[in-house]
Amino acid sequence: PADGVKRVVIVGSGPAGLFGALRLLEDGITPIIVERGEYTDARKKTIAEISTKGSVDGDSNYCFGEGGAGAFSDGKLYTRSTKRGDAGRILFLFRFFGASESILTDAHPHIGTDKLPKIVNAMREKIISLGGEFHSCTKCVDFLSETENGKKRITGIAVEHTKTKERRTIEADAVL
């Protein structure tokens, strides 16, 4: 980790946020994750209301919520990119959190829509058990900064709870 980095806020609990949090924990940094949408269990009900009631929650829907936009997709894991890191490591982590062992050997790995939300829940639970924080229904509304020696740096974020509209700030050494 960078010298002096102790508090890192991650905006969003999609794949980048979840895997970023796990990586920070490996480096001894406990992340604070803020997510605009709901946890997957509540989000599943909110998404169902799109079809049953015709109502769309602007803060928790197919795009926003724990697990990101793909949490309620078909669960296919496919990339042709080889320059973005170790895809095998990602598959191993998915396996660790509950995916079928076949994703480690299949040419086109597939987790399945029914399993992916449970895997995302397991990832959150592990991050919390290791000291990380999760704040659902919490939208980043601004960045905090200060200027020191003519250089501007981020010092945290301002957030708003999407249900209560309560605002607060979260200080951090870094924001992802």
Say what each PLM segment does.
Residues V8-V11, V34, C140, I157, ...:
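Short hydrophobic core segments
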Residues G17:
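N-terminal Rossmann-fold NAD(P) dinucleotide-binding loop
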Residues P1-K6:
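Extreme N-terminal leader/targeting segments of oxidoreductases
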Residues A42, A48-F134, T138-K139:
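Conserved N-terminal/central alpha/beta ligand/cofactor-binding core
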Residues I29-R36, T40:
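Short beta-strand "acidic-cap" motif of Rossmann-like dinucleotide-binding folds
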Residues R23-L24:
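Aromatic pocket-lining residues of Rossmann-like dinucleotide-binding sites
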Residues S136-R153:
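A conserved short coil-to-beta-strand element within the FAD-binding core of flavoproteins
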Residues Y78, I154-T155:
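Rossmann-like NAD(P)H-binding beta-loop-alpha module
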